[in-house]
Regions:
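Extracellular glycan-recognition regions
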Residues: 1-220
Length: 220
C-alpha cells in the first residue's frame, strides 16, 4: 500500500557520535560492538527509553535492523510520541520521565507503542506475540504472531519496517506482515499524527540496532 519516498532521517547507529544528541530516560547502557549500537541495562530494574531527537511528521516509513543478544526482556518502539496537549516530547513543562512504563502509558504524553520482542515474563515466552498499544491509556489495539527467534537461534539482523500514515499502522519483519491496524479516532481518542520515536527495553534484555531510517510514506 505504501513505499519509501524521500528520506527524512538516516542514522547508522554504529558509533557514539551517531547518538550524541539522543536522549536517555532511565537506566540504559550504550555500547558499540560489531558495527551496531548495543543497548543493555545498569541493573535488573533499569528499564529505559532512548529517544531520537527529531520530530517526524505523519506519513512515515521507519526501518531499522534488530538483533536479540540476551533475554529475558522486552524491546519496543515508541512512535508518534508527543505531549498530550500537542507539546514537543521534550517540553520542560511535561513531567520528568525515568523509564518506568507507567510514565509513558498513563502520564502526560500520547504515543503508539510497538512491542516486537516480548520475552520478559514466562507467559510471554510461552506464547509469543507482537503488540500495538495506544496511549494515553494502556489500550491494546492490535496483536500479531512474533516470528523472531530466541537469541541462541538468531543468525542475522532482522529488518523491521513500520508504516504510520494517519489512521493506518502496518508492521513487518523481513517483509513478513506481522500486524495491521486502523484507528477509528473515537474508541481510544483522536488519531495521533506526528511526533518522536524511541527505543525502549526492559531489563535484563540486551539487543543490537543499526541502520535506522525514516522515509516519507508514498502510496504505491
Amino acid at each position: 500500500m505504501y513505499k519509501e519516498g524521500v528520506c527524512l532521517y538516516r542514522n547508522p547507529l554504529r558509533t557514539p557520535e551517531d547518538v550524541k544528541d539522543w536522549r536517555m530516560e532511565g537506566g540504559g547502557r550504550l555500547s558499540f560492538e560489531n558495527g551496531s549500537l548495543n543497548l543493555s541495562h545498569e541493573d535488573d530494574g533499569a528499564h529505559f527509553v532512548l529517544w531520537c531527537p527529531e520530530t517526524f511528521p505523519d506519513g512515515i516509513v521507519v526501518t531499522w535492523n534488530f538483533y536479540p543478544i540476551e533475554q529475558p526482556g522486552l524491546c519496543m518502539l515508541f512512535f508518534a510520541a508527543a505531549g498530550d496537549k500537542g507539546e514537543d516530547l521534550f517540553d520542560s513543562g511535561l513531567n520528568k520521565r525515568t523509564g518506568s512504563y507507567q510514565e509513558y502509558h498513563s502520564g502526560d504524553i500520547n504515543a503508539l507503542h510497538l512491542s516486537y520482542f516480548r520475552r520478559k515474563y514466562a507467559e510471554e515466552r510461552a506464547f509469543r506475540t507482537c503488540n500495538l498499544r495506544k496511549s494515553r491509556g494502556f489500550h491494546l489495539v492490535a496483536m500479531g504472531a512474533d516470528p523472531l527467534p530466541s537469541p541462541e537461534d538468531a543468525d542475522s539482523p532482522y529488518r523491521m519496517k513500520l508504516i504510520k500514515v494517519k489512521d493506518y499502522v502496518h508492521f513487518s519483519i523481513n517483509d513478513l506482515p506481522v500486524l495491521e491496524w486502523r484507528d477509528d479516532g473515537k474508541t481510544y481518542g483522536p488519531v495521533l499524527h506526528g511526533g518522536k520515536i524511541g527505543l525502549r527495553q526492559m531489563a535484563p534484555m540486551k539487543a543490537a540496532y543499526h541502520d535506522l531510517s525514516v522515509h516519507q510514506a508514498v502510496r504505491r
